[in-house]
Structures are given as structure tokens and as C-alpha cells.
Amino acid sequence: KYTGGIIINPKTGSVYALGVLPSFDPNDYGNAENPDVYRNPLIENVYEMGSIIKPITMGIGLDAGVVTPQTTYDDKGFLTLDGYTIRNYDGRGRGVVPMQEVLNQSLNTGVAYIASQVGTRKFGDYLKEFGLGTETGIDLPNETVGLTDNLDSPRAIEYATASYGQGIALTPIATVRALSALANGGVLVTPHVAKEIEYESGASKKVSFPEDGQVISKEASETLTRMLVGVVDTALM
């Protein structure tokens, strides 16, 4: 079992901190009791990320023009697709609620509704544009690609579950990169730890990493940011 964290500048992709416990002392490399600590699970392992994917889904819905913060849907607490039933975390329905409440209360049925309004194929394409299922390009070894084959499925249930981070498995660094785009005007950046290369001769060279494109509009990004501030101000305080 691991615990870890990543702190990144969403506008540049510069990684300020990336750490995992348990770890090892690089000055005493051969003395680790468990060789598993030599792996970096933030780069090399994949996980079903769950509800932290919901802001991405909301951003997609805003960008596609199928919802606004005031758009309402009838939350019955469950939704059945392809013979499978998905439920809110507590199984309860909220009745007619706006999209702001989908984020405030982390409603699975709400983000599944957004995915259905966007359309399964288009929604899957959006998630791929966020870099989910591809390498981020981080300048660290052994990066693993996420498991996102479900985004090519003809079944609507796969996209509904993906909308709240289940059924697809992602590396933490790929997830952080995708979330960073939401705070960067919709622009995806390459995460990186290097800034400059210094040579023995005394010369140095700045290292640059490219932006990877606009995944949602700046307007959608700004609207989503206001919605997430609303979550903190009204639902968490």
C-alpha cells in the first residue's frame, strides 16, 4: 500500500513536488526491505480514480454546450443502462437539481447524464483529448499508459461509469495533468521535473516542454472554475 502526492503548476506543467511513501534512501539503494519501493506508483501504476474525474466531465459538458451551471435534470438516485444500474454514492435521489449540485453533492447520475447529452462517442473522444490513455511525456522513466479500452465500446454504460472515474484506470500523473487543463484555460501541458541542464564545462541549457493543445475552451474552463469555487464555499464550508 502506498500514499503519495503531486503538486504541479497547471500553467507550465512544472512539477514542484512528487513523493510516495513507503520509499527508500537513494544513498543506501540496496538496503530496502521491499523491492516494490523502487517503483514509482504515481507514474507506473494505474487506478480507477473515481469522483475526481467528475470536474473533467462537467468541463466537457460545458464545452460541448449541452449544460450550463443552471441546467437541471431529474435525479432519481439511480440510472439503468445496458441492463446495469448505477447509483449515487448513498443511493438517494435529489429530484430536480442544477448542474452546480451535481458537483456540490458528487452525484454519479448527474455526470452520467452529462455524458449521455454529449453523446457516447464524442464524450469518449473528449476524454482521449485530455490525454487519458496516453503517456503524459513526463521526463521520468517507466511511465505507464492508462487502461481506457472502454472508451471504444458501443455500450453506453461504459461511458456513464467513465464519467465518474470508474471502468477506466489512469496513472496519477495523467490524472493530475488532465485536471491541470481545467485550471489553465483548457490548455493541456506536459508535466516535467527538469528546468535546466548543466554541463561539466559550465555551460547550461534551458529545457522546454510543449503545450499539447486546447482541450476545452477558456470560457468553459472559467465557468467550471467558478463552479468548483462554489463547491468549496457552499458544500464544504
Predicted feature locations:
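Beta-lactam-recognizing serine transpeptidase/beta-lactamase-like catalytic domain environment
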Residues: 3-51, 56-237
